[in-house]
Each structure stands twice: as structure tokens, then as C-alpha cells.
From Swiss-Prot:
Family membership: Belongs to the protein kinase superfamily. CMGC Ser/Thr protein kinase family. CDC2/CDKX subfamily.
Entries under PROSITE patterns matching the protein: PROTEIN_KINASE_DOM, PROTEIN_KINASE_ST
PANTHER family per UniProt: CELL DIVISION PROTEIN KINASE (PTHR24056), CYCLIN-DEPENDENT KINASE 7 (PTHR24056:SF0)
Swiss-Prot/TrEMBL keywords: ATP-binding, Cell cycle, Cell division, Kinase, Nucleotide-binding, Nucleus, Serine/threonine-protein kinase, Transcription, Transcription regulation, Transferase
KW Oxidoreductase (keyword) present: no
Binding site for ATP: L10, G11, E12, G13, T14, Y15, A16, V17, I18, K46
Record's protein name: Probable serine/threonine-protein kinase KIN28 homolog
GO biological-process terms attached to the record: cell division; positive regulation of transcription by RNA polymerase II
InterPro entries linked: CDK, Kinase-like_dom_sf, Prot_kinase_dom, Ser/Thr_kinase_AS
Enzyme's top EC category: transferase
Gene name linked to the record: KIN28
Subunit-structure text: Component of the TFIIH holo complex.
EC number of this enzyme: 2.7.11.23
Function: Protein kinase component of transcription factor IIH (TFIIH) which phosphorylates the C-terminal domain of RNA polymerase II during transition from transcription to elongation after preinitiation complex (PIC) formation, thereby positively regulating transcription. Essential for both basal and activated transcription, and is involved in nucleotide excision repair (NER) of damaged DNA.
């Protein structure tokens, strides 16, 4: 049996508490508060919260474990171990120092165009590793994009992942990063929901604040339609048949140029392709990685020179 020393608490999510830990000399239990380290490499220990109704939390843990066992990529956080202790599932992951939300919110950090290009390319490569295995992440946001001390991206928090082709709930993805088809109640969706989320993260790297920060689903849709235009059947066949479709105010189709004056034409083109309302027309991850934006000047900032 492997034993881990659990040290300080790192953070807390919807269904788990995360602690800093280290491998220790084996004892009669997998988790201890003190002991002798056998490795100085830290790990993140994710303890699934105990509740009276644990089934939902356990399902999330199982989804995360299954997905991470399948994905082998330097752009995705690595699964190290799993165990049950004190009636709680624990997931041991590689420890990563910070996340993209912290970087974006840190006003002392200057984010240059090459930095944005490097980070969003790594995010896309991580998402591609999911999509090629027919896994939808369903919760891409800056807080779930971990950043190493060198600036390397690691996608994390796979508790909402599902396989492409399953009929699903629309209540996935944090609202600010949720695709319009989800906001309108679609249960028949796929990998394009992740691409919308990537677009929102891309925009946030330029703006340093969330692009669409609605307090309700209706307000969220209104903000999206104000910026991108209200969808019509001609451009998005079937939109009016979605379960939560309403007779929304008609806003004209607009360009993002005014909001992103510092973005290059290639960056704007990729952003508009990611934030396409009709999911059938939204750019795929593979095509996004091949977009001319990543070949244009300036080049992506090298690992080790990113502002972390």
C-alpha cells in the first residue's frame, strides 16, 4: 500500500477538496498527517467530499479517473494514484503550481500577444487529446487550466467529462463559458461545446475579464446575442426548437473588432470561428490548431519565458 502525507489545503471545488501531499514510507493506512518522505516531488490529493447523497460526487470521481486513465498527454494533468480512505475516494494527481485564472487576474503580470498565442495553443492541444478519444471535457475555464512554474498548460478537473454520442444534461460547464446550445437546453450536443469554452478563455486572455459574465442563463444569452447577433433559423437550423428557446430580442450580427482592438486580424478570425453560434459551423479543435493565427507573427512565447 502506498502512503501519502497530507499537508496544507490548496483549494476546494464543487465536489472535492484538494490538498498538497508527498509520498511517504508505507504505513498501515494510505493517508497520514506526518511521516518520512520518500519523494520530494509534491502531489495534489483530491478528496471527494462526503455527503448524505454521495452518488453524484462518486460518479464525478469515476468519470475523472476513467478519463485520466485514457488520456496520456503533457497538456493534461497526470493521474498518479487512487484509493479509498475514511469512506472517501481520493485521487492523487501531479501537482501544478497555479492556474490561468490566477495569471489573468494578476495585474502585475503583463500578458503579451505571444503569451496568449502560446497558452491558447497548449489549451487546444490538451482539448484535442480529449476529443480524439471522443471525450468531451464540459468544464473548460481558466480555473481548470493549470499552469506550471515554466508556463506549461495542463487541463484539469475531468469530473464532468462524457463520451461523445451520449445523451446528456445541458447543466454542464460554468455559465460564463457555456455554449449557447447548452444555455437553450440542448441534450444532443458534442465537442463544439468545448470549443465555445476555449473561445471564451481566448477572449479573456485579451480582455483580462470574462467576455460574457451573466448572472442568469437568460442574461448570459442576452450578452452573447448583443455581441454576436441573435441567431435565426436561416443561420442555425433548429435553434427555435431547442427546449429553452425564447423569443429573444433581435440584435444584428456584429463584429468583435470593437471589443478586441489589440487583437490581430488572424486572432479575431480564430476567435469568431470559436464563438460561432451554430455548433455545426463552429471550428473543430484540429482545424483551430492549424489556423494561420499560430503561424503569424509574433510566434508563441517559448516555455520558460511565459509570465507566470
Amino acid at each position: 500500500m502506498k502512503t501519502y502525507i497530507r499537508e496544507r489545503r490548496l483549494g476546494e471545488g464543487t465536489y472535492a477538496v484538494i490538498y498538497l501531499g508527498y509520498r511517504a514510507l508505507p504505513q498501515d493506512k494510505p493517508l497520514v498527517s506526518s511521516g518520512t518522505r520518500i519523494e520530494d516531488v509534491p502531489v495534489a490529493i483530491k478528496k471527494i467530499k462526503p455527503t448524505k447523497y454521495t452518488q453524484g460526487h462518486e460518479i464525478s470521481a469515476i468519470r475523472e479517473i476513467k478519463s485520466l486513465k485514457r488520456i496520456d498527454s503533457k497538456y493534461v494533468v497526470r493521474l498518479i494514484d487512487t484509493f479509498v480512505y475514511d469512506k472517501c475516494v481520493h485521487i492523487v494527481l501531479e501537482y501544478v503550481e497555479t492556474n490561468l485564472e490566477n495569471v489573468i487576474r494578476n495585474s502585475d503580470k503583463i500578458i503579451m500577444p505571444g503569451d496568449i498565442k502560446a497558452w491558447i495553443l497548449m489549451v487546444l492541444r490538451g482539448v484535442y487529446e480529449c476529443h480524439r478519444l471522443f471525450i468531451i471535457h464540459r468544464d473548460i475555464k481558466p480555473n481548470n487550466i493549470l499552469i506550471t512554474s515554466e508556463g506549461m498548460v495542463k487541463l484539469a478537473d475531468f469530473g464532468l467529462t462524457r463520451g461523445i454520442g451520449n445523451r446528456m444534461t445541458p447543466q454542464a460547464v460554468t455559465r460564463w463559458y457555456r455554449a449557447p446550445e447548452l444555455l437553450m437546453g440542448s441534450r444532443d450536443y458534442g465537442s463544439p461545446v468545448d470549443m465555445w469554452s476555449v473561445g471564451c478563455v481566448f477572449a479573456e486572455l485579451f480582455l483580462r475579464v470574462p467576455l460574457f459574465a451573466g448572472d442568469t442563463d437568460i442574461q448570459q444569452l442576452d450578452m452573447i446575442f448583443r455581441a454576436l447577433g441573435t441567431p435565426v433559423e436561416r443561420e442555425w437550423p433548429g435553434v427555435s426548437t431547442l427546449p429553452e428557446f425564447l423569443d429573444f430580442q433581435q440584435y444584428p450580427k456584429a463584429s468583435l473588432n470593437g471589443l478586441f482592438s489589440a487583437a490581430s486580424s488572424d486572432a479575431l478570425d480564430l476567435l469568431e470561428k470559436l464563438l460561432t453560434l451554430n455548433p455545426c459551423n463552429r471550428i473543430s479543435c484540429d482545424d483551430a490548431i492549424k489556423h494561420p493565427y499560430f503561424k503569424s507573427s509574433p510566434p508563441p512565447t517559448p516555455i520558460g519565458k511565459l509570465p507566470v
